[in-house]
Amino acid sequence: MPGTPQKNKRSASISVSPAKKTEEKEIIQNDSKAILSKQTKRKKKYAFAPINNLNGKNTKVSNASVLKSIAVSQVRNTSRTKDINKAVSKSVKQLPNSQVKPKREMSNLSRHHDFTQDEDGPMEEVIWKYSPLQRDMSDKTTSAAEYSDDYEDVQNPSSTPIVPNRLKTVLSFTNIQVPNADVNQLIQENGNEQVRPKPAEISTRESLRNIDDILDDIEGDLTIKPTITKFSDLPSSPIKAPNVEKKAEVNAEEVDKMDSTGDSNDGDDSLIDILTQKYVEKRKSESQITIQGNTNQKSGAQESCGKNDNTKSRGEIEDHENVDNQAKTGNAFYENEEDSNCQRIKKNEKIEYNSSDEFSDDSLIELLNETQTQVEPNTIEQDLDKVEKMVSDDLRIATDSTLSAYALRAKSGAPRDGVVRLVIVSLRSVELPKIGTQKILECIDGKGEQSSVVVRHPWVYLEFEVGDVIHIIEGKNIENKRLLSDDKNPKTQLANDNLLVLNPDVLFSATSVGSSVGCLRRSILQMQFQDPRGEPSLVMTLGNIVHELLQDSIKYKLSHNKISMEIIIQKLDSLLETYSFSIIICNEEIQYVKELVMKEHAENILYFVNKFVSKSNYGCYTSISGTRRTQPISISNVIDIEENIWSPIYGLKGFLDATVEANVENNKKHIVPLEVKTGKSRSVSYEVQGLIYTLLLNDRYEIPIEFFLLYFTRDKNMTKFPSVLHSIKHILMSRNRMSMNFKHQLQEVFGQAQSRFELPPLLRDSSCDSCFIKESCMVLNKLLEDGTPEESGLVEGEFEILTNHLSQNLANYKEFFTKYNDLITKEESSITCVNKELFLLDGSTRESRSGRCLSGLVVSEVVEHEKTEGAYIYCFSRRRNDNNSQSMLSSQIAANDFVIISDEEGHFCLCQGRVQFINPAKIGISVKRKLLNNRLLDKEKGVTTIQSVVESELEQSSLIATQNLVTYRIDKNDIQQSLSLARFNLLSLFLPAVSPGVDIVDERSKLCRKTKRSDGGNEILRSLLVDNRAPKFRDANDDPVIPYKLSKDTTLNLNQKEAIDKVMRAEDYALILGMPGTGKTTVIAEIIKILVSEGKRVLLTSYTHSAVDNILIKLRNTNISIMRLGMKHKVHPDTQKYVPNYASVKSYNDYLSKINSTSVVATTCLGINDILFTLNEKDFDYVILDEASQISMPVALGPLRYGNRFIMVGDHYQLPPLVKNDAARLGGLEESLFKTFCEKHPESVAELTLQYRMCGDIVTLSNFLIYDNKLKCGNNEVFAQSLELPMPEALSRYRNESANSKQWLEDILEPTRKVVFLNYDNCPDIIEQSEKDNITNHGEAELTLQCVEGMLLSGVPCEDIGVMTLYRAQLRLLKKIFNKNVYDGLEILTADQFQGRDKKCIIISMVRRNSQLNGGALLKELRRVNVAMTRAKSKLIIIGSKSTIGSVPEIKSFVNLLEERNWVYTMCKDALYKYKFPDRSNAIDEARKGCGKRTGAKPITSKSKFVSDKPIIKEILQEYES
């Protein structure tokens, strides 16, 4: 494996902070050999040396269990441990000479962020890598909100959520190494590349060009490209990359001279050494420049740049100022620019041209060779010019199109000063003496302007690709804002403080980036594979309690002179009551937890709050990290608690424990983050998180954040951590490296080609032995990376234990996993790529495009929420001067929707809330934040004041004035989560299995429990699905697996009885294919009754809550014990009694008894992360999966893991799983597990064909479309049913006699007409309207309204009518039309939403009618049409254009059937005006009203410019004017 040269050898690798002088080499060499000589098996755990308390003495490593510190001076003379391993094993290599670089000075970064100078940096630290014997739990990690059953709860998760007990934090520091790269090899490879510059315009040449040159241009340089070292092959930090040469060699005199100055790093390097495992080595001498071409270009632009034979040595380039000046023009370090083939990329030279097959043929060369003597040279030259011009024109067109797309991608919804957003259009790599590797990125901005960005150490180690988005946060130390490096300004000696963020539109949490420091692979796997199995953790629960106790205590102290222990105990008791259930499921007593908090935290919190939460900093001495100094710092105010900040500038997000105002020396106030930790461990990830919080605050408030405060509740004092430029750079490097694994979430993947799923390399460290995701990591290593025991780094035999089960069918397993993992990734790209729209579109643009946003808002009123303590209702209205604003009802935001509130200056997610009400002029949002805008800018004084959200003293009038210093936007919170749960479900097929019933002891709680099959991999499903093992059934002559007897008076038909018998004889699984209306729910309820009567436990699950509840409603009159998991407001009122109430649970045994005695547990497929599934003593005997044909295979695998046998019920002739990505759909993701098993093993299927829903005519349609006459009516009564009209004569009163049209409404409502296609081809006024992706048809909406009005006036109840459409824009229009009390009970849904439901009468609006006869793509899916038709019981009315709908080939024969049966009713020209119903016009007007007259403004007409792109409003105005 790249970067993992060791084989089962371990060393105690070290991370050191720079400090003092270089000393003798021999000592550390001997120590390294001693370490290497140790055996792999460790007899004693390593102890953790104290931090910030180490002296730089010459201390050798002893064999004691505690590894003592080694002086930094000794460590500096060592090479990396893995190089020593090679040296020892081969006994041929010598350690490289060390190098000490001159000390750098630190400078402030930019207006966005100020960084502290060297005096606040740490002194000397030596930290040993170790593997703790017991799990070392962090006190604060972020739980995944995705797939949470209650979406509301995940909108504002705590920064200290409960984390599964088995997930443990392992402190480890990476020390990854790759073999040295041979620079000569790079030069040789580049020399083989034929590359030429292409001019911007091709004109007649003065002389004949070589035909090879022309062919090369035509073919697009189809030569072998030099390879760029993959990032996975690089070390964990750029500092230690051995294949890239370092700065100039330092001679002995310079070393002696610099001994007194220490290392060159700026400020605090304790974090940097952990991030980078820093080392220095002697650089090879180099006299030539190596230029690498880009090999990673995805599309469009590609630059060709080659090496001239006459390339001159640039060893003389030493002047950094000269280098910087050259870089500004994009021509830095080019060889002999007048004569070199490597020239600067022109605007039109960045597209890769793939020639056709004929251009690749040699026939053109042969032809030219044969005719060369017969044709005049100028004729050949003219012909060649024509070819070149043709190619050039094609290139220019393609390039312009690509560049336009890139420029669009580079636009930002809210540009910021000092932040530049660019898209890479081409790139190249250059090897320079005394500089090392340099990459030159040709970029384009949102205005279409191109520029060059020069990237050096450390940013050069990122794998840039064409099309990547970068943010440059401009600093102030270097004049060239397009140079990203560690170089110093030669005049001021200040370090380059420009920062780079790669793929900034993916936001990573501070916790994720912090954990990546120890192991990048582990962090990536946790994010991409969400394991729903978790165990309760007392440590996490305790951390939550202590966090909230400290936060409450701080808030109390702000308004009181002192806090007493009595107050703390009072607050603690309240918190213990809140967390009582969490404590109980940890098998602990509440009193014990209280004593623990009082013993280990309460006294410290009391001392800390009384001493440090004070207006004055007198006596509040705070230690400064990395130094022996202290500084008076107090917390004079608290700005916010649990502040949630999203930063699309830095590509980061996080919850801050507290944002505080710190009073430092000379009463200078600073806004800084206060990070609270409650555990015993001291992890470098805490420092990473804290520094990330400084960046987040810098983005939110646009002020310098110079440090952060860290407080451990087990201590009485806090520590100040200065914000250091070098540390910030490497934290962003870690974040940027993570982003490369999630690029698919930014752009939708369209191609069907399978992409490679790459992971960071194995850490191969001692911490791997106790890693909580070791099984997943090694299985993936085997499936994706052809892993071997030697490369795993695990103790001997362990890799085989974890992966040997894959050997029996490894090739098939690899193919299966790779295929479906790729399909999940493609689908994930389509789901998540829309997330960035929130950041990249300004509010008005997003509102006009999609309606998912309301823009230009101001606060009109703020009131406290009457029902929810600590909540407020913010009322928003449009700006007063905005006369052109649309009605808020025109948006897609509705009551009870979750929304995100941001300001229009680029500060996103100020808070999240739920819509309380919305009307044309106002919208009310319930939030838990008192102030939205607490940033007050005095432009005259140039001072920014930050108001406290916790203790705001503003009056109502001042509050609103303060809030309206900015304008707001409200976005519908449809941020899509990744498919990490589905990806883990797929992986679980290949994890090692666990034998059930084995006694195991939990290492933390010491409790003994028996294993369950669900604790390991899903071996049974793997054999059935991947190995294609056929399911087994008991023979009809044998007794069934589950003995049963049906009652004599049962109403079940023969089909249903056969289906039940199939289930009871199944040894693995059974499938029930239930056609529409055939009683699937009844059969499932009967099966549950039989299984429970035989003592079996059942897990009932489906994709939707309604499907689960429909089955439970049929069981409500039984004595079966049922537990319905889910939030009450999502559960049907009739089944809410089954939602568990744990108030009666007083102990851990009470809880176990309650869940283990429950016969039926019901939940959705995505609700399987409940703690019940972990604490269950046994898995379920049966899992019943309803709606199985609508669930994609990876999602269905989740609940099936928890049962010994399973039953799937569905109909794959109805709606398939919803798949957004076309490539994923065509690749097979749309094929459900139900359909797969139906087709592979039809003997496992029981069909239900007798239906009791639809009349005979409607069944005819369904049989014609799908079922080939298999579907039958259950009895004659069902066959002959019709829609009854109690008062049909009422319609005559509403006829418009002036209209010549016949009384079409009475005709189509005639009860004998059970299927009607209402064809309006003769009505010219009815035509579709298309606005971007929104397709509506107002004429059809009016016809639908008249049909509903006609039925209501004829006596048909609203509850018996359903309105359906296939288009969501039409759905919104219909809902607005019927938004009146008189239509209560009328359901208006899409075909997908109507699945599983039925009505006596269904009206379908087909929408499409246009002159092009384009019927659209939705009708091509016959399964969707089938669902639409089969929702009706006794009457089906289809409103559409026969000519347009009939143009769809897939549906043409269906239209012909309607004509043959005389079911098409063609309307007359003026049919729209035949009836006039009461309040009809008012309903339409209110639904469509998008604007009204404004006082003092010119009236808007249908010819106004304002409505030119608003066809709905334009049509309304035309109706008014007519």
UniProtKB/Swiss-Prot annotation:
Region (Helicase activity): 901-1522
Subcellular location: Nucleus; Chromosome
Originating organism: Saccharomyces cerevisiae (strain ATCC 204508 / S288c)
Polar residues composition-biased segments: 91-100, 287-308
Modification Phosphoserine, positions: 17, 237
Modification Phosphothreonine, positions: 4, 962
Entry's cofactor comment: Binds 1 [4Fe-4S] cluster.
Entry keyword set: 4Fe-4S, ATP-binding, Chromosome, DNA damage, DNA repair, DNA replication, DNA-binding, Helicase, Hydrolase, Iron, Iron-sulfur, Metal-binding, Multifunctional enzyme, Nuclease, Nucleotide-binding, Nucleus, Phosphoprotein
SUPFAM superfamilies given in the database record: P-loop containing nucleoside triphosphate hydrolases
Resulting phenotype, residue 768 to A: Abolishes iron-sulfur-binding. Impaired nuclease and ATPase activities
Protein name per UniProt: DNA replication ATP-dependent helicase/nuclease DNA2
